[in-house]
Regions:
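Long hydrophobic segments that form regular secondary structure
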Residues: 63-101
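Gly/Pro-rich active-site capping loops and adjacent beta-alpha segments
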Residues: 1-71
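Molybdopterin (Moco) oxidoreductase catalytic core of the xanthine/aldehyde oxidoreductase family
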Residues: 3-32, 85-124
Length: 128
């Protein structure tokens, strides 16, 4: 993930290898992970590669979230690391990069459209 000195995201590059078990049952986790990378942040440039790795474990399949938890953890962890490196508060770096109401409807670089949302207001309601 690349940032300006002021903490604005300029790009995200993600190479994800997911354990699909002994044989693939569903591609939903990997395909959803691909689509869901980034939001609710305004990321001008993205390159995401998602691959499944066959292992000697039980096959995996979808339950709830299907890819969202994995990619959310990755992006939010990168936000925390960037905040520490730049010297910004964890909430402030998020606030600076959230999709604004003025940008709606917002199409992500990976094709999802957000037609509504008050992401900054929601962030103000919690303590990080």
């Amino acid at each position: 993930m690349a940032f300006t000195d002021e903490g604005k995201i300029t790009a995200l590059q993600l190479d994800y290898v997911g354990n699909v078990g002994a044989h693939p049952v569903s591609s939903a986790v990997l395909s959803n992970l691909l689509r869901m990378a980034g939001p609710p942040y305004d990321i001008p440039a993205m390159h995401v590669k998602v691959r499944g790795a066959l292992t000697n474990t039980t096959p995996t399949s979808v339950y709830r979230g299907a890819g969202r938890p994995q990619v959310t953890y990755i992006v939010e962890r990168l936000m925390d690391l960037a905040a520490a490196a730049i010297g910004l508060d964890r909430a402030e770096i998020r606030r600076r990069n959230l999709i604004s109401a003025a940008q709606l409807p917002y199409q992500t670089r990976l094709g999802l459209t957000y037609d509504s949302g008050t992401f900054s207001d929601n962030l103000s309601l919690i303590h990080i």
